[in-house]
């Protein structure tokens, strides 16, 4: 393992930071940042903003204030080595005769997978790998997981009262948390490419499930709303079927044919699966999302869906918001019966906690040996 200086770590952390600017718009590509340094001074920066657009390295070179020959380049993910919508970034760095390249992470995508690093070294460029590795892994976690497992990273998000109730006695769950927490949820939605919701939540709250900025404006890229409804119980007039964001309706043979025709007239695509004891076939849903190269799935309820996903081991992370209220025993828990005894309960790792206004956000991660999905 290389020993890197604090200054070198600073430059890599800057590359990771600017890479986050593409977090919402870059998927299914990774949100990569690049910094060009000459004589310990940043002369160029760039990040990958959208699929099909210029890569971080190309933009950093374009934005450089002087020729970059002999410079050091810091990039949060291995430069690509293949021809796609853009030429290989490794070739670009070779062409501009950079001196050294610092890479936080090897790209697990089979199209790259160390080949970019090999190309640079074959051209006589010094390459150092692993600087800022943990920070880059945290930033690119959904991308890394999807490219490694060919499966989306799944976050179960919920808002609950201090005493753990996710809804009141009438089943209403909106406005449990403060505005600051709801703004954070809007960003979390924007960072996801799909939102899963069960029919009961739609019937109770009639949510939009759109990703909105604090000022109320929509984020430039909206997630796919995936409505799971095995019997056709969600009214076609529900807000999730409006044109603000794309929607996928998932159902079973129990759904009336006339209902599907109505959705067809609204241009809402329908995915038919076999019936299961918990409703729709979640494995078929995830197969569909994997085919669409969805990197991150956000689950927004309700209790039945949460329970099914945890039992089937689809959930990787929990994001829990606690609101400033006590609802009492409403029989509205976050999760239903899992059948766990204390000694066999899923181990969680606390990743972070944050005060948002008058609410508390806590992020937990389920241990890797637990969250590998059970494949049919």
Curated annotation (Swiss-Prot):
A GO biological-process term: riboflavin biosynthetic process
What are the names of the required cofactors? Zn(2+)
Could you give a GO molecular-function term held by this entry?
A: zinc ion binding
Which reaction is catalysed here? 2,5-diamino-6-hydroxy-4-(5-phosphoribosylamino)-pyrimidine + H2O + H(+) = 5-amino-6-(5-phospho-D-ribosylamino)uracil + NH4(+); 5-amino-6-(5-phospho-D-ribitylamino)uracil + NADP(+) = 5-amino-6-(5-phospho-D-ribosylamino)uracil + NADPH + H(+)
Q: Does the keyword Secreted apply?
A: no
Binding of substrate, residues: 173, 189, 209, 212, 300
Q: What is the protein named?
A: Riboflavin biosynthesis protein RibD
Q: What is the lineage of its organism?
A: Bacteria, Pseudomonadati, Chlamydiota, Chlamydiia, Chlamydiales
């Amino acid at each position: 393992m290389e020993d890197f200086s604090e200054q070198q770590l600073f430059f890599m952390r800057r590359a990771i930071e600017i890479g986050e600017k593409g977090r919402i718009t870059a998927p299914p590509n990774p949100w990569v940042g690049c910094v060009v340094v000459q004589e310990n001074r940043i002369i160029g920066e760039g990040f990958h903003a959208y699929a099909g657009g210029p890569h971080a390295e190309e933009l950093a070179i374009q934005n450089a204030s002087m020729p970059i020959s002999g410079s050091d380049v810091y990039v949060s993910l291995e430069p690509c080595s293949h021809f796609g919508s853009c030429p290989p970034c490794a070739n670009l760095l070779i062409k501009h005769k950079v001196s050294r390249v610092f890479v936080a992470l090897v790209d697990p995508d089979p199209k790259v997978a160390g080949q970019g690093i090999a190309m640079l070294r074959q051209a006589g460029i010094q390459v150092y790998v692993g600087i800022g590795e943990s920070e880059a892994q945290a930033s690119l976690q959904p991308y890394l997981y999807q490219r490694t497992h060919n499966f989306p990273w799944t976050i179960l998000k919920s808002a609950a009262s201090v005493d753990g109730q996710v809804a009141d006695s009438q089943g209403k769950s909106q406005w449990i948390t403060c505005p600051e927490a709801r703004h954070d949820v809007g960003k979390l939605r924007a960072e996801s490419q799909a939102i899963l919701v069960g029919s009961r939540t739609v019937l109770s709250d009639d949510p939009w499930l759109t990703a909105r900025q604090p000022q109320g404006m929509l984020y430039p890229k909206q997630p796919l709303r995936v409505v799971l409804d095995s019997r056709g119980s969600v009214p076609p007039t529900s807000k999730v079927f409006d044109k603000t964001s794309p929607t996928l309706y998932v159902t079973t043979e129990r759904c009336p044919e006339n209902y599907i025709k109505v959705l067809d007239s609204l241009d809402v695509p329908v995915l038919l699966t076999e019936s299961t004891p918990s409703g729709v076939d979640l494995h078929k849903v995830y197969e569909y999302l994997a085919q669409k190269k969805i990197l991150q799935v956000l689950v927004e309820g309700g209790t039945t869906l949460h329970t099914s996903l945890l039992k089937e081991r689809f959930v990787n992370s929990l994001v829990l918001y606690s609101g400033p209220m006590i609802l009492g025993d409403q029989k509205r828990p976050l999760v239903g019966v899992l059948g766990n005894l204390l000694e066999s309960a899923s181990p969680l790792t606390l990743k972070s906690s944050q005060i948002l206004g008058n609410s508390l956000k806590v992020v937990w991660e389920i241990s890797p040996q637990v969250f590998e999905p059970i494949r049919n």
